[in-house]
């Protein structure tokens, strides 16, 4: 099974993430940021991953450090769980509607870090979650996992729906990309390594 657990501690946050790519063995999310917990739960559910996230941070300041550092640790955990990437599909693409909103996420588990984020999030706050940190989360995730991640909202009105559709689409795109395909010889690259 492709699993990994990584812990990270700084003066601002203490985070532990356990990820199981092959079995939805349970989802337990506790970051202290309710809306963010909900989004991570959706990512895991729609990616069909087992995911445990335990995070504490300087929420008396704001949620930024907790959200961004969780993205870093989740990305590192994904990278470790993938191992040598032999026979993975590598690419994933998902479009997800959420009422009036349509979001698309495309990933490439290429070993090259890059984020394109195109979403207008007009409501600055959802509970204790500052919506501008959504992009920071995806940036941290993409760079720590060493993947290309293109996330965009094609249209929509409600900020909650936009972010929710992005997290669901990320889960679905990652599910495609991490899927093992026995027809692939070695890694899915002409270079022989990703």
Swiss-Prot record:
GO terms for molecular function: imidazoleglycerol-phosphate dehydratase activity. The keyword Protease does not apply. It is found in: Cytoplasm. The keyword Cytoplasm applies. It is an enzyme of class 4 (lyase). Signal peptide: none annotated. Its EC number is 4.2.1.19. It comes from the Bacteria. Its main location: cytoplasm. Pfam families: IGPD. GO terms for biological process: L-histidine biosynthetic process. Keywords: Amino-acid biosynthesis, Cytoplasm, Histidine biosynthesis, Lyase. GO terms for cellular component: cytoplasm. It catalyses: D-erythro-1-(imidazol-4-yl)glycerol 3-phosphate = 3-(imidazol-4-yl)-2-oxopropyl phosphate + H2O. PANTHER family: IMIDAZOLEGLYCEROL-PHOSPHATE DEHYDRATASE (PTHR23133:SF2), IMIDAZOLEGLYCEROL-PHOSPHATE DEHYDRATASE HIS7 (PTHR23133). Belongs to the imidazoleglycerol-phosphate dehydratase family. This is Imidazoleglycerol-phosphate dehydratase. It comes from Limosilactobacillus fermentum (strain NBRC 3956 / LMG 18251) (Lactobacillus fermentum).
């Amino acid at each position: 099974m492709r699993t990994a657990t990584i812990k990270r501690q700084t003066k601002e946050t203490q985070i532990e993430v356990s990820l199981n790519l092959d079995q939805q063995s349970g989802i337990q999310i506790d970051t202290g940021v309710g809306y963010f917990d909900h989004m991570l739960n959706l990512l895991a559910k729609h990616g069909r991953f087992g995911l445990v996230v335990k995070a504490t941070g300087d929420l008396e300041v704001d949620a930024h450090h907790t959200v961004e550092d969780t993205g870093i640790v989740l990305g590192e955990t994904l990278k470790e769980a993938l191992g040598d990437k032999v026979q993975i599909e590598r690419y994933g693409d998902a479009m997800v509607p959420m009422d009036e909103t349509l979001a698309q996420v495309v990933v490439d588990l290429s070993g090259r870090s890059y984020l394109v984020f195109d979403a207008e999030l007009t409501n600055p706050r959802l509970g204790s979650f500052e919506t501008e940190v959504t992009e920071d989360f995806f940036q941290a995730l993409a760079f720590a996992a060493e993947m290309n991640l293109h996330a965009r909202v094609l249209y929509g009105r409600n900020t909650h729906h936009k972010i929710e559709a992005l997290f669901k689409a990320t889960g679905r795109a990652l599910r495609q990309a991490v899927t093992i395909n026995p027809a692939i010889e070695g890694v899915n690259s002409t270079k022989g390594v990703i």
